[in-house]
UniProtKB/Swiss-Prot annotation:
Domain PPIase FKBP-type: 162-247
Bridged cysteine pairs (disulfide): none
GO biological process, one term: chaperone-mediated protein folding
Full protein name: Trigger factor
Amino acid sequence: MGIIVLKNEGLNFHARISTPLSEIDYDIQKELLDLTKKVKVAGFRVGKVPISIVKKKYGISIRNDIIEKRINNLVNHVIKEYNLNIIGRPKIEELQNEPDKALEFTVKIELLPKITIPDLKKISLDRPKLAVNSKDVEAQLEKLAALTKCYTKESKTKIKDGDQVTIDAIGYIKDRAFDEGKLNDFKVIIGSNTLIPGFEQQLIGSKTGSKVDVNVTFPENYHARNLSGKDAHFVVQIKAVHTAEPTVIDEEFAKKFQSNSLEELRTHFAKQIENESEEAINTIMKMNLFDKLEKLLDFDVPESLLEQEKNILKSETDKNKHDGSLLNGKSSKEIIEYYNKLALRRVRIGLLLAEYAKFKNLQLEPDDLKKVIMQQARNFPGQENMIFDFYKNNPRAIEGLRGPALEDKTVQYIFNNEIQLKEKRYSKEELEKYLETEEQQRISLI
C-alpha cells in the first residue's frame, strides 16, 4: 500500500493511494476458489466446477466487489492513520482500475474544524418575563364567556350584531343556482364572519319570517376555486332569531370548565397567558444568544456544509417569495451577501452547539422529540392531529427532527447552566411591543 499526501491544510485532506496488483489478484483468486466449492453449474457436481468456468461467469462481478471493498478499507486506513475527523463521504477521483495494473485512486476528504468552546459564563442576557395581571385574566374570562353564550331567548325584534340567526338560503351565480350555495337550518352569529365577507351584515335589520336578498363577491383566495372571485346573489329566508342570555362569570361558570372554583380557573388562565408568551420569548432569547456567539466564533467551516445551508436558505426564500419575503426588492448581490453571512453564522453556531452537546454528553429523550413535534403542530392551527399522525406514521420524518430537538435542548441547557440571565418583567402590552421591536431590529439587519 502506498500513500502520497497531496494536500493537508485547513479542512481538506487529499491523498493518492495505491495497492499492488498482486494483492488484488490474490483476493480475486481466493474468492473464486471459495466460490468453486459451493456454486451450482449445469453438468458439474457441486465442488467440482473448474475455476476457469467460475471465473468466466462471475469474474467481473467478483473483481468489482473486491475493488469496492479494497477502496473502502484503504480509505478507512488513511482516516485512522492520520487521525482525521471527517465530515460527509470521502470522494474518490482519478480511479485507475485496469485488470493488469495496480489499483490507484485519489481520495478527497473534508474535515471538521477543531472547535474551542468559548467561556459561555461571560455571556449575559436579559430574559423577558410576562407579569400577568388581573386585567389580562379577566379579559380571557370574558372571551370564554362570549364563546359559550347560550342562545335560548327567541327575539321578535330586528336582527342586530351578536344575534344568532337561523336561515335557509339558495345561492345564484348569473341566475343559476349552485350546490355550494344551498343552506338549510344554518345557524350563524351575526358579526362572527363565518360566512362570505358582507353576507352577515346584510341580514341586520331584518326579522323572523322575512326574505332578504344578499349580494356578495367570493374572495379571490376562496377554497372552492370554481367560486373564487365570482359575484353571487343569495335569497335568504330568516327562520329564527335568538339573543344570547347574559353569561355570569361565577363559581358555577368555572365548574363547567373542570375547575373547582373561579379562583382556580383564574390561576389556569394566568398560567396559560404566561405559557403563550414563552415560545416567542424563547425564540428571541435564542437569537440574542446566537448574536453573542457569532461574535465569538471565527473558525473555518466545511465548504459542503456552507453550500448545503445556502441551498436551504434559497429554498426557504423561494417558497416565501410571494408572502412578503424580507428579500423582495433586494439586488442579486445583496441576496448573495445575505445568504453567505447567514449560512456561515448558522453552520458555525450549529457546529459549536454539536460540540458542546458532545462535551456535556447531552442525549435526546422521547419527551424532547415530543416537544418539537408539539411546536410543529402549533404552526398548523386546526390541523394538529394531522401533524401528530404524520410523525407517528413516518419514522424518517422524526429522524429529521432530532437535529433541531438536540439544538433546542442544548440551548436550554446553556441558558440554565452557563450564561448570566437577568429577568426583566413586562406587562402584556409592554412585552408585545418589546417582541415587535426585537423582530423589526432583526429585519433591519438584512
